[in-house]
Structures are given as C-alpha cells and as structure tokens.
Amino acid sequence: MNTIYFDNSASAIPCPPALGVFAETAKIYANPSSLHSAGLHTRRLIEDARAKVAAGFRCQSESITFTSGGTESNNTAVRGLAHKNRRAGNVVVTTRAEHPSVVSTALALEREGYETVFIASPGGVPDLNELESVLKSKKVCLVTLMQANNQNGAVTDLKKVRGVMDSTGTGALLHSDCVQSFLKLPDESASDAVRFCDSASVSAHKIGGVKGTGALYVRKGLAMPALMTGGEQENGVRPGTENVAGICAMAEAVAHYGAAERAKVAKLREYVIDSLRAQLGENVVITEPPRHIDSLFNMALVNVKSEVALNYLNSVGVCVSSSSACSSKAKTNAALASMGYGAEYERSALRIGISPYNTKEECDLLVAALKGALAFRIKGK
C-alpha cells in the first residue's frame, strides 16, 4: 500500500536535492574546527550554507547560529534572552498556543524566580490589547510569540507586536518561533522576523531538509548566552562539532523553497478545502484564519473523534495528525483549547500539512479517505 503523506507540518517530505547534498556531504568527514586543508574545506561548506540560510531569513550570515532543530533553538532563545535581560524584569509573556518547547521552557524558568504570563490567543493570534496591558503593568524581560500557529496556520503580525512593545517603552526582548512560517510567507512579510524580532527559530525538516538540524536568528549586536558549555562553535552559542551534512542539506532545502513552491502549496490547499466542502458539506468544519500560511490547516469531521479518523486513515495509507507531533501523547490539545475552539471541535480536530511535493492526485485520495472515515463512523454508529 502506497503512503499518502499529509503530515508535512510535523515533518515535511524531503527535498530531493537536499537529500542528494546530504548524502554527498556525509562523505566529507574532516572536523570543521581543524586547521588543515580538509578541515578548512569543511568550514567553507558550513559558511556557504550559513549564507544561504541567511538569505532565506533576509539577514546577514553572522546572525545565524546552527542548532539541532526548532526545539533547541526555542530553548536557547527563551532561556538565554530571559537570563540576559533579567535587569528589565522577571516576567516572560507568551500564550498557551505556543509550541511545547516555548511553554515548557518558560514554565521551567519559574524555578529560577521568573513569572510566566499567558495572554489570550483567540484563533491562534495573540491579543495585543492584553499584551499592552501586561507590558504596562509588569516588568517584562521577554515576549515570545510564534509567527505562524502550528495548529491552524494563523499568522501573527510581528510588526504590530513590535509596535505595541515600542509604544509602551518596555525593555523586553522579542523572540518568535518561526518553525512553521519560515519561507512560507509572501515576500512582503518574509523579513518580518528579522525586522522586528531579537531572535527567531527555524527547523530544517519542516522545509524539506533532514531532521536534527535547525537555526537560530539572533539580532546583530545581541550576544545570545549559550545553553550548553564545552566548545566555542557557532560563535560560542552552540558548542559541539557541527552537523555538516545536515547543515548543507538545510541550505539546499532553503534554496529550493521559493515563490513557485508557495504558489503550488496554495493551489493544493484551495483544491483540498473546496473538495472537502463540496463532498462532505456540513459534515466537515474547516478553520481558516483571515491571515494564514497555506502549508497547513485544521479541520474536524463532525462527530468523528480524532483517534477514530486517524486509525481509519492510517488503515488506508493516509497520514495526517491531530496535533503538534511534539505534544501528540497529550490527552487533550491544550493549544486548540486555548484558542477557543471548544471541547467538541478539539475531540475531532485533524491537522493537514501540505508540501510542494504533494500532488493533485494525492489530494483526491486524501479527500476520499476523509470521506471514508466519515462513512466508517456512520456505519459503525
């Protein structure tokens, strides 16, 4: 049975050129910190890759630190910036809709005397009026808000967030989890993280790279404290011998995710949603935030629990998810609940992640499988 894969928001279908680069670069074994010619060659590969990833961010190469992925990048930024900016206050502001690597790190900081304030995020977009109120009433060291929600794709306007912060005169720093939004926003918004944030995190395997590689953007002139010790690699921010093959593959994936790929994903999304509404009618609920990335959307089959739908879809070779993969073992979807969707929707929620490597034919099979899951529930009622 062939696999029809629409869980690209958990881990995307690999970019073939990126896999090719990974395979070739894995043969280059010299340590990039070594001073002989082989080591210097490996170092050049990393720096060339850094330039390509920086181009995706629209920033300078020296602002990019390579990590093991989005979770490490978020941990490094949230903990590091809170510590660095402790003089401004002890309050970290975020939302319950954030990725677990942000929420858990913020809560862990409470053991060090920090306070976590969760502002509302209806529909996955933070309440900026509440943010303003907190900034005016508390001593905030860090605001951390994702650019694109990993459950429904809702996009947060980082320019407006920065505007609220500037208007209050806060000394807080701003971090954004850009794992889902990186390369997936229109050109006019592609540089927002660099223009308005002090740091931003991304992950290679969400854009067609390989797992185990990510990057952290850090504003020029801002010294990010290291999360670990034991080496001076990556400007001292991330010690340890670099994952050369993963880094080079990430750069290749960045180079192959552009306007054409975004346009294809947008067309596939529209096709799937139109097909679902035409064929399932009132039996499907689809969330479409006013401003969103096209690579994912959240939906529910009415009166079909997520696990029932997932089991049926898996039996016919279709892969989707019901939540962020990093929180898939949780009994409830805290992120969706915090966004105001309600318990009934939450129990039936499915996340569809679309890749430029998906096809229209696969979209037809996805819709047919979802239709089959609904019929399976009705038949077994």
Please annotate each region the language model reported:
Residues 1-381:
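Pyridoxal 5′-phosphate
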